[in-house]
Amino acid sequence: MPKHSKRYNEIRKLVDSEKAYTLDEAVELLKKTATAKFDETVEFHIKTNIDYRKSEQNIRSTISLPHGTGKSVRVLVFAKGEKAEEAKQAGADYVGAEELADKIANEGFVDFDVAIATPDMMKVIGKLGKVLGPRGLMPNPKTGTVTEDIAAAVSEFKKGKVEVRTDKTGNLHFPVGKASFEPDKLKENIKSAYEQILSLRPAGVKGHFIKKAVVATTMGPGIKLDLNVLAEGKR
């Protein structure tokens, strides 16, 4: 077992691993356990009841947080002509076509958080799957990153739109803010994220969709949420 620091062991005592906390209690604990020297990210970990062996049950989508993630999001756009100009006007950090694809393919350039493309660019970026795919950066219609409405997509991701996808065991992990956020903003982000995840329930899931939900700061212990009260008991 990994050896934890003295700091971690001290804050670990604040959290009862057997207890399921209300959202108010959980956010209060998030504040108390965020003791690192940097502004820790608040992470949401959700254990689902999907059968991850069935591809139709795996989730890949996006959610929008009311108050964003608190992180500066670097957006790259594959587009030409008028669409490229729209991307620049909307605040995209990198805009280009073949030359940008070549930079990624030949130089391994991946200094960005989101990649968006117009549909006509898919033939250009098809070769980038091996580089972008494993990093979760490959544009995909399911996540709104292959679109004609480039300006709206750039704006949404800049404001805090978050991609969510189940991992190899059917669980979800994504940011919902920073430890420095005001308590009410953290609560609103967490509650909104949970409700949006509920709406993504695959048709074939039997019983409860959500088995467990935990929030934690980057360097802090997991805090289990009481699902009986989080969204009026919806799971």
Curated annotation (Swiss-Prot):
Pfam families cross-referenced by the UniProt entry: Ribosomal_L1
Domain of life: Bacteria
InterPro entries for the chain: Ribosom_uL1_bac-type (IPR005878), Ribosomal_uL1 (IPR002143), Ribosomal_uL1-like (IPR023674), Ribosomal_uL1/biogenesis (IPR028364), Ribosomal_uL1_3-a/b-sand (IPR016095), Ribosomal_uL1_CS (IPR023673)
Keywords, in A-Z order: Repressor, Ribonucleoprotein, Ribosomal protein, RNA-binding, rRNA-binding, Translation regulation, tRNA-binding
Gene3D superfamilies named among the record's database cross-references: 3.30.190.20, 3.40.50.790
A single Gene Ontology CC term: large ribosomal subunit
Family indicated by similarity: Belongs to the universal ribosomal protein uL1 family.
Summary of subunit composition and partner proteins: Part of the 50S ribosomal subunit.
Name of the protein described by the UniProt record: Large ribosomal subunit protein uL1
UniProt source species: Fervidobacterium nodosum (strain ATCC 35602 / DSM 5306 / Rt17-B1)
